[in-house]
Each structure stands twice: as C-alpha cells, then as structure tokens.
Amino acid sequence: FFRENETVYMVMNYLEGATLQDFIITARDLKTQKVFRESTIRSLFDEVLRGLRIVHQHKMLHLDIKPANIFITDDNKAVMIDFGAAREVLSKEGNFIRPMYTPGFAAPEMYRRDSSMGPWTDIYAVGACIYACMQGFPPNEAPQRIDKDRLSLALTKLRGVYSDNLIEVVEWCMALDP
C-alpha cells in the first residue's frame, strides 16, 4: 500500500493459479464428504487473515471478501484480490459510499444504511468463506438469517466432519450482532 494524491494504491505481483471459488466448485462436483480438508481451510485462511490484518492496519476495509476474490496460487498460497470495493474508514460513523455486496458473504450491516461498518464486516465474510469451503455453497443471506437462522443447524450437521473449534470459529465470525 502507498498513498499519493489523496488516493490509496496497492501494487500486486502477477499470480498464477485459480480462485477459491473455482476450487470449491470443483470439489463440490466431486461430491466428497468434505469439500476441503480442515488443515487446508486453516492454512488458507491463516494467510487470508494475515493479509486482512494489513488492510485493517491501513484503516481500510475490503468489503467484498468472497471465494471469487481469494486467489490460490500454484504453490497453494491464498491471496486476497479485487479491492475495487475497498474503502477507507473515514470515521467511526462509517461515512463512505456503501459498496455493492455479494449475497451470502455480506454482513448484516451492509444491507442497512443506518449501520456502521468496520473490521467485523470483513470478518463476517471470512466466516462465510470458511462455511463455503466446508459446505460447498454459500450460507443464506444475512436478512434471511435474521428472519430464520439455519446456520447453527447446518453447522451441526458438520460436527464430526470438522472440529468443534472450526465450527465455533465460523459461528463467531458470522454472528448477526457482533
């Protein structure tokens, strides 16, 4: 990252590989019990969270974290891409233009004009991405979850396939009222 002319720039290397979404679709089509092994999920999202920490340290929010925006390099490293929706956090009130969002990966506050966004908004999306790696498809949209939350039921069915710890991480990330 660097700032120049009141604009934040990010320069990235050229990468070869595929998006996490591509891997999820391929694994889902194979119809295995686990879309991804837990060790793979933990390794990939350790890297995603390290990158997200840097974004947040620069007082920025990504605001469009989803499997299509997580790139897996040929040497199995995870890199966040597509910062087109990224916004600088200007104030605690979240005074900035609200970006478009992706259903299933957008936190509840992205659907409401009167809600503040912050690092928790990106964390919700990380949890939704982990969920997609476990289930093979995205979770229900946040407004549907507010009306009738089936997340816990869906995750309960994964107990024994994935550790209780990983399931609790997803529940924590995707809390409707963090």
Language model features: what each stretch is:
Residues G160-L176:
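Conserved C-terminal C-lobe helix
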Residues F1:
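Activation-segment/catalytic-loop signature of the eukaryotic protein kinase fold
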Residues N5-T19, F23:
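Conserved short submotifs of the Hanks-type protein kinase catalytic core
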Residues L44-F45:
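Activation segment signature within eukaryotic-like protein kinase domains
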Residues N95-M110:
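Conserved activation segment of eukaryotic-like protein kinases, specifically the C-terminal portion
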Residues Q21-F36:
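AlphaC helix of the protein kinase catalytic domain
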